[in-house]
């Protein structure tokens, strides 16, 4: 899988930009705030229908325009894909894949798979559990449409249950019983799929992490949930929801479920979030990203596109070497402010260089 070309109109600081990409390594060089990350953002948006930088689609539209247009042409082993996206300031958007209208975001996912690594991804390890849940949900939605459906349903029912808790009376108590049954059904599936994904990360990630650290470190991922028996997760979750209802009524929110879960990353049996050095935390994120690449490859038979947003400068020479020696079979799009530090690894590879300056791109 690789992107042949990208066409952007009124996207961020680009007026009308058409770009041919190499199926191998593409390097975008320029100072900060020139538009390098905007290119990656457009590709990421074409993959999952969301930006990695903002929750407001209107932020993607050039400030003096009413809409933006993105076209991404993707070469696949079986069938090429042309993804067209129109985003309007009134909040509406229109998406087609090979000229067929997309009604649900789940229909967009899987046409273009990407894995993105940016400096902000350190939050997956360092920050609150929501970042780790978001990581799992995005990666699972890329490869499992059922997961996406059940996640949407779970969040919808969760919101309705929380509203019912705030307006509780004896009649609503029966409604909450129904919500609990539905939450248990969808929540159990989410919990089990997340745990399975972490099992895959453990198998693949351990080998990757050992390569990066020259066998000095062992990494482990462990799902943290109130559910003890995954085989009977639905039944157990229903029991726990009923048990915690009094507390939920006092707090006007649902205290148990996959929306509260987390996962632990440990290196040599030590919690990386609390006790890991900055270097260890970066390596853990690197392991997560490259393990995710392999999981997608194992499931769909093709590597996704790898997006590296100004992260190589954040890595020491050993980690840089690992990254650049691991991308031979993967279309990789790199942004950086200078290539001096990585040029020694790239000179033997098929790579294309682009200079970015104030929304203008020059192929070198």
From Swiss-Prot:
**What are the alphabetically sorted keywords of the record?**
ATP-binding, Cytoplasm, DNA damage, DNA repair, DNA replication, DNA-binding, Nucleotide-binding, SOS response
**What does the entry give for GO biological process?**
DNA replication; DNA synthesis involved in DNA repair; double-strand break repair; SOS response
Q: Name one GO cellular component term.
A: cytoplasm
As for subcellular location, the record says: Cytoplasm
- Please list the residues that bind ATP: 30-37
Q: What is its main location?
A: cytoplasm
One Pfam family of this chain = SMC_N
PANTHER family per the record?
Answer: DNA REPLICATION AND REPAIR PROTEIN RECF (PTHR32182:SF0)
UniProt similarity note: Belongs to the RecF family.
The molecule here is called DNA replication and repair protein RecF
Species of origin? Clostridium botulinum (strain Langeland / NCTC 10281 / Type F)
């Amino acid at each position: 899988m690789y992107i042949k070309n990208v066409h952007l109109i009124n996207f961020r600081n680009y007026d009308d930009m058409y770009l041919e990409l190499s199926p191998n390594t593409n390097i975008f060089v320029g100072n900060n705030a020139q538009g390098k990350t905007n290119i990656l953002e457009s590709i990421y948006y074409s993959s999952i229908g969301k930006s990695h930088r903002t929750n407001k689609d209107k932020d993607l539209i050039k400030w003096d325009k009413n809409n933006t247009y993105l076209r991404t042409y993707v070469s696949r082993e079986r069938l090429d894909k042309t993804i067209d996206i129109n985003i309007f300031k009134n909040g509406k958007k229109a998406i087609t894949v090979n000229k067929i209208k997309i009604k649900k975001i789940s229909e967009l996912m899987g046409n273009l798979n990407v894995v993105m690594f940016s400096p902000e991804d350190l939050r997956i390890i360092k920050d609150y559990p929501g970042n780790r849940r978001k990581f799992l949900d995005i990666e699972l939605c890329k490869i499992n449409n059922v997961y996406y459906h059940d996640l949407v349903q779970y969040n919808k029912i969760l919101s309705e249950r929380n509203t019912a808790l705030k307006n509780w009376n004896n009649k609503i108590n029966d409604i909450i019983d129904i919500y609990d049954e539905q939450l248990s059904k969808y929540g159990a599936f989410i919990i089990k799929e997340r745990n399975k994904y972490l099992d895959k990360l453990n198998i693949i990630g351990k080998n990757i992490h050992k390569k990066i650290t020259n066998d000095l470190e062992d990494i482990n991922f462990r799902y943290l949930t109130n559910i003890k028996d995954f085989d009977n997760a639905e039944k157990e979750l229903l029991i726990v929801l009923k048990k915690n209802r009094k507390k939920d009524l006092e707090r006007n929110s649902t205290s148990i479920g996959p929306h509260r879960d987390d996962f632990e990353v440990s290196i040599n049996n030590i919690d990386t979030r609390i006790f890991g050095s900055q270097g260890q935390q970066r390596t853990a994120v690197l392991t997560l990203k490259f393990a995710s690449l392999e999981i997608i490859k194992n499931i769909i038979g093709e590597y996704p596109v790898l997006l590296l947003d100004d992260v190589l400068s954040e890595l020491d020479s050993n980690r840089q070497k690992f990254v650049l020696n691991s991308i031979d079979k993967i279309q990789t799009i790199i942004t950086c402010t200078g290539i001096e530090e990585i040029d020694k690894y790239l000179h033997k590879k098929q790579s294309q260089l682009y200079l970015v300056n104030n929304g203008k791109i020059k192929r070198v």
